[in-house]
């Protein structure tokens, strides 16, 4: 549980503390060690808990889904800087979702297409302009999908067919598109790295098994148009080297744009956290060193 975890953290801190001190001194730092602070010490922890509770009471804290880096082997999330990238050979598949879908898409991960809820095209791409806003029901390799054609300036016209299958649950970029366009989010890869029940006949398969089955199905239906060899950067866990899966997870969020009024507070009078943060920096009530970072 939580308490046991925190005890292990404290053990690690005790072991590492002297090493960190020596490293800092070797770098030439002359610090006032009497003012040393630790993120999880009593004073800092109390301040964080008090502020979290206050923000929760002011309706500034809410819980929602967010796509995270997930290691199916370690069963844990990874920060962006804990993800390593390894160049490897990969296949780029070009295919149509179904015979009655009007155009093809290209992807290196056909198994994630089981969770597609839209297809994005660049608004400047005249090939697809007439399809934007339309919706299609397709039978993709034996799984029913409802796809909406959306326009997004981030789509690279020159990559693949210029049409991007949007998988909100398993791509950071696609998740942002889904939020912006109010698209459904369907999780087809679970924490164990296997296909979920949402993908019907492929449930329980590994991603590689599902990929092979889907490509076989597309070939059988005459929908696979092209299979190209490319170089691809694979995201892997820095600890074990397992391929990282982007999956949605429950996270805590701060509503930085929500306007609130706090009685007796001179700042929060129908203003958001973002607005107040900018105001106090501009007035010089909070100093940011060096000053050049005030513009960020």
Language model: regions and residue ranges:
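Residue patterns forming the tRNA-binding/recognition surfaces of aminoacyl-tRNA synthetases
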Residues: 1-103, 159-296
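Protease-associated
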Residues: 99, 103-166, 170-176
